[in-house]
């Protein structure tokens, strides 16, 4: 699973996800992409599940690009621990995704296979998404 090799600080504030994506809203690598419509934190496990769903459906043909990286630490306290006594330890890593962000790109497969692969990937994610296609010049 994806996670940073090292970070400047171990823990972060929760923060909020406001506004639209400033960058990463266009297709850069592939012909088909999966674009977020809602703001949400996507965990490394969800990214990996979506990647596996796509590559399995494509039968390891074509190419997949993951355009988001889980760089936000999410902390959690152990089960049945009372409130207080400091912040919990890092439990998982997540990527903050704003509306309009392209999360995955696909190339090297035909239209039907690409759309179905992205639909399967979208089912693994906790947000509404849209399949986008690069217009040929």
Swiss-Prot record:
One of its GO terms (biological process) is translation. GO terms for cellular component: cytosolic large ribosomal subunit. Signal peptide: none annotated. GO terms for molecular function: rRNA binding; structural constituent of ribosome; tRNA binding. InterPro entries: Ribosomal_uL16, Ribosomal_uL16_bact-type, Ribosomal_uL16_CS, Ribosomal_uL16_dom, Ribosomal_uL16_sf. It comes from the Bacteria. Keywords: Ribonucleoprotein, Ribosomal protein, RNA-binding, rRNA-binding, tRNA-binding. Part of the 50S ribosomal subunit. Belongs to the universal ribosomal protein uL16 family. Binds 23S rRNA and is also seen to make contacts with the A and possibly P site tRNAs. This is Large ribosomal subunit protein uL16. The gene is rplP.
